[in-house]
């Protein structure tokens, strides 16, 4: 069994925030693979799903981002899932928009959801890093992640979540390299090989106007 966690903040106010792309991806996995309805459990919302031959629990912690580890730890203990079989989907500032990378363990890069999970559960879990790009200035990060995706970003966000969902059985099977490659090819095929952040797009537009 796998525990697949999407990180985000609960409530309509945060639903389309960049910080909530983990929730969006897990919702799409649930939709594509016809998961059971989400129920309130483990200080979050949880649903069972079959991904290929692997049974998985989808989890969206409802504790707010900074306390995500409480929810993850509760679900992990209940199902007795090894930490290596916990997979966390989260927004990644240090990855270009529309890119995806999978890694095991490592640092938290200032991500408070990961920091909470690491503190309460340990570090050797798999992370699916969903690139949202960086606003360019550290002082802008807080507002950037807690703002909604711009309208111009929504198409690639939807396509990234769909590609993640389509190939989730590979992720559940532990075939991380194949999963990552399939998502990359799907995104390239949809024209998302190079995507600028809104700030980068604005600068490029200003340069073109001069």
Swiss-Prot record:
Alphabetically ordered keywords of this record: Cytoplasm, Hydrolase, RNA-binding, tRNA-binding
Site residues, Stabilizes the basic form of H active site to accept a proton: 91
Localization, UniProt: Cytoplasm
Active site, UniProt feature: 19
Organism: Methylorubrum extorquens (strain PA1)
The protein's role, per its UniProt record: Hydrolyzes ribosome-free peptidyl-tRNAs (with 1 or more amino acids incorporated), which drop off the ribosome during protein synthesis, or as a result of ribosome stalling.
This enzyme's EC code(s): 3.1.1.29
Enzyme class (EC, first level): hydrolase
Matches recorded under PANTHER family: PEPTIDYL-TRNA HYDROLASE
Binding-site residues for tRNA, renumbered to this chain: 14, 64, 66, 112
Family annotation (InterPro entries): Pept_tRNA_hydro, Pept_tRNA_hydro_CS, Pept_tRNA_hydro_sf
Description of how the protein assembles with itself and partners: Monomer.
Site (Discriminates between blocked and unblocked aminoacyl-tRNA): 9
NCBIfam families, A to Z: pth (TIGR00447)
GO cellular component: cytoplasm
UniProt catalytic activity: an N-acyl-L-alpha-aminoacyl-tRNA + H2O = an N-acyl-L-amino acid + a tRNA + H(+)
Pfam families named among the record's database cross-references: Pept_tRNA_hydro (PF01195)
Family, per entry: Belongs to the PTH family.
Protein name: Peptidyl-tRNA hydrolase
Gene: pth
């Amino acid at each position: 069994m796998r525990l697949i966690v999407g990180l985000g903040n609960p409530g309509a106010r945060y639903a389309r925030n960049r910080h909530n792309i983990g929730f969006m991806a897990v919702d799409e996995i649930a939709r594509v693979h016809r998961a059971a309805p989400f129920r309130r459990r483990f200080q979050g919302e949880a649903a069972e799903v079959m991904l290929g031959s692997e049974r998985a629990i989808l989890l969206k912690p409802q504790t707010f981002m900074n306390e995500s580890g409480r929810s993850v730890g509760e679900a992990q203990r209940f199902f007795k899932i090894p930490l290596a079989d916990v997979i966390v989907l989260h927004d990644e500032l240090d990855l270009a928009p529309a890119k995806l990378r999978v890694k095991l363990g490592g640092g938290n890069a200032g991500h408070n959801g990961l920091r909470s999970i690491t503190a309460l559960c340990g570090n050797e879990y798999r992370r699916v890093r969903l690139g949202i790009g960086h606003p360019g200035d550290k002082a802008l990060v807080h507002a950037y992640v807690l703002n909604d995706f711009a309208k111009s970003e929504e198409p690639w966000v939807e396509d990234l979540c769909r590609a993640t969902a389509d190939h989730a059985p590979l992720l559940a099977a532990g075939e991380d390299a194949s999963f990552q490659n399939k998502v990359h090819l799907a995104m390239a095929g949809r024209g998302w090989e190079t995507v600028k952040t809104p700030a980068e797009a604005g600068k490029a537009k200003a340069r073109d106007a001069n």
